[in-house]
Amino acid sequence: LLAGTDETPGNIVEKDGTITCGKIKIRFFGVTHTIPDSMGIILETEHGWIITPGDYKLDQVDGIVSQEEEKEYSIFDKAKVLLLMTDSTNIENEGFSLPEIKVHQGLENLIRKVSGRMIIAAFASHITRLAHVVKFAETLGKKIVLDGRSMKTNIEVAIEAGLFKPKKDTIIPIEEVND
């Protein structure tokens, strides 16, 4: 909705869902990311497909893509793909980025080792990663302070959407932090 305008109709879409716009079929497919429920878009035209996976991270360990992801991308095997619009962070670096499981393990090791205050910087959109940090901190009886409007808003939305449920007193306001 745009401020000051009438309500604009919208469509709620799911992974594997489709909508039609004129002669173009718009299809959605799931992608792996630290943002829950991330999806790519396929524009199916009479000439072939135009694809954008959006923001994604291959779910892989040691360069081997997961079976779930292999299955998800198999929809492209027999398709006539005209254009794939994608980008890659750190493309100039050889190899793969760390698998999310290893990122989680690294964070767990750091959180476990630090006895005092710890500051973790993260993208506010990395909900899965942030939820993991909160859950692990809970197992150790540690408190979490969120700072930044986007960080607070995204976590509130994730909690309201049922993506994770922190214990009542795990996330505290910054004013409750002792010097």
Where are these regions (language model features)?
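His/Asp/Glu-rich metal-coordinating catalytic cores
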Residues: 1-178
